[in-house]
UniProtKB/Swiss-Prot annotation:
Cofactor(s) needed by this chain: Mg(2+)
Protein name (Swiss-Prot/TrEMBL): Uracil phosphoribosyltransferase 2
One GO MF term: uracil phosphoribosyltransferase activity
Catalytic activity as recorded in UniProt: UMP + diphosphate = 5-phospho-alpha-D-ribose 1-diphosphate + uracil
Taxon lineage: Eukaryota, Fungi, Dikarya, Ascomycota, Taphrinomycotina
Length: 220
């Protein structure tokens, strides 16, 4: 089980139930096959989307029920959109769409990491045309050094999206990455399923789960 350090107050970690821990065990196991990896990842992603959407602002609304009564409920107070960091972030798009009745626009960012310097470079950016007026869920399953996510967040800010309107949704993070990201963006909000203690010499999360994109899309 991962042992997180004290985290910024804007970081929400899913409740570490036995069920979630069992899913994380399957996800991390190098013996887990492709179809089981995808099934397990999707279950965790669904949990993350529920938590992320619960953190967004809501407003009261009055509806009529099929029984002839009225009900005071809530509905989102702001429109949202997703932005996935390619390619691994695309694995989280279906979970977001399913949680929002498939009506949420999704943008794409391609950020590549130099395997020698570990620096990130923006290669492609396509956002929904009104992204600056929406709350943005930034999707990337793994957070290692934080360089790619920092570049992605700065790109969103440069496009007119306020830092406080960005929620980073993530499966596995590490302490170093969280520290680096929040040192630059303290108003950011983050939802993750697990926080691992360290990076290895190649700057991969340990214990981690391997290359998430390769395992999810079956290219390993």
């Amino acid at each position: 089980m991962s042992i997180p350090l004290e985290q910024p107050e804007n970081v929400v970690v899913l409740r570490q139930t036995m069920y979630l821990l069992s899913l994380m065990t399957i996800l991390r196991d190098q013996q887990t096959g492709h179809s089981e990896f995808v099934r397990t990842a999707n279950l965790i992603i669904n949990m993350l989307m529920q938590e992320a959407l619960s953190a967004l602002p809501y407003k009261k609304c009055l509806i009529k029920t099929s029984s002839g009564g009225t009900y005071t409920g809530v509905q989102p107070a702001r429109d949202i959109c997703g932005v996935s960091i390619l390619r691994a972030g695309e694995s989280m798009e279906y979970g977001l769409a399913a949680a929002c009745n498939y009506s949420v626009p999704v943008g794409k960012l391609l950020v590549q990491r130099d395997e020698t310097t570990f620096e990130a470079k923006l290669m492609f950016c396509k956002l929904p045309k009104d992204a600056q007026d929406r709350l943005v869920l930034l999707l990337d399953p793994l957070l290692a050094t934080g360089n790619s996510v920092i570049l992605a967040i700065q790109t969103l800010i440069n496009k007119g999206i306020p830092e406080e309107n960005i929620v980073f949704v993530n499966l596995i993070a590490c302490n170093e990455g969280i520290t680096n990201v929040f040192a630059k963006f303290p108003k950011l909000r983050m939802v993750t399923a697990s926080i691992d203690p360290e990076l290895n010499a190649n700057k991969y999360v340990v214990p981690g789960c391997g290359d998430f994109g390769d395992r999810y899309f079956g290219t390993c």
